Curated annotation (Swiss-Prot):
Pfam families xrefs: CRCB
Keyword list, A-Z: Cell membrane, Ion channel, Ion transport, Membrane, Metal-binding, Sodium, Transmembrane, Transmembrane helix, Transport
Activity regulation remarks: Na(+) is not transported, but it plays an essential structural role and its presence is essential for fluoride channel function.
Transmembrane parts of this sequence: 43-63, 68-88, 100-120
Compartments in which it is found: Cell membrane
Coiled coil: none
Function recorded in the entry: Fluoride-specific ion channel. Important for reducing fluoride concentration in the cell, thus reducing its toxicity.
Naturally occurring in which organism (per UniProt): Frankia casuarinae (strain DSM 45818 / CECT 9043 / HFP020203 / CcI3)
PANTHER family on file: FLUORIDE EXPORT PROTEIN 1-RELATED
Membrane topology: Multi-pass membrane protein
Keyword Cell membrane (UniProt): yes
Protein name per the record: Fluoride-specific ion channel FluC 1
Gene expressing this chain: fluC1
A single MF term (Gene Ontology): fluoride channel activity
Phylogenetic placement of the source organism: Bacteria, Bacillati, Actinomycetota, Actinomycetes, Frankiales
């Protein structure tokens, strides 16, 4: 039954990724992929919250349930974030001669996503731990 929850989460996450990416990117007049950066960091924060809540045994019990992890963690966050687009956009930056932006995208994305996941987990522990 959890596979249905993963599908439901992904059905929400994929269009949310597209809409967020377009909304963010159209507000920036740059080749830097701010839309992809935003969805990846947001998904990392949300996944940190979900994993932190599950690890802390958050009450009510549904918050830390396997179903919520499947729906939000695997489904929504999995579809919201996009490693393949991040990789392709970084490659495109490098091939177009924007090597500094490509390097900034790699370093910034990894650091920001890791920081967001850690922040999400810390917030969950502060609330439910």
């Amino acid at each position: 039954m959890n596979w249905l929850l993963v599908i439901a989460g992904a059905a929400a996450g994929a269009p949310l990724r597209y809409l967020t990416d377009r909304a963010v990117q159209t507000r920036h007049d740059t080749v830097f992929p701010w839309g992809t950066f935003t969805v990846n960091v947001t998904a990392s924060l949300l996944l940190g919250l979900v994993a932190g809540a599950a690890g802390a045994g958050a009450p009510p019990a549904w918050v830390a349930s396997e179903q919520v992890v499947s729906l939000v963690g695997t489904g929504l966050c999995g579809a919201l974030s996009t490693y393949s687009t991040f990789s392709y956009e970084t490659l495109r930056l490098a091939e177009d001669g924007a090597r500094l932006l490509a390097a900034a995208n790699v370093a910034g994305s990894v650091l920001a996503a890791f920081g967001a996941a850690a922040l999400g987990a810390a917030l969950a522990r502060a609330v439910w731990g």
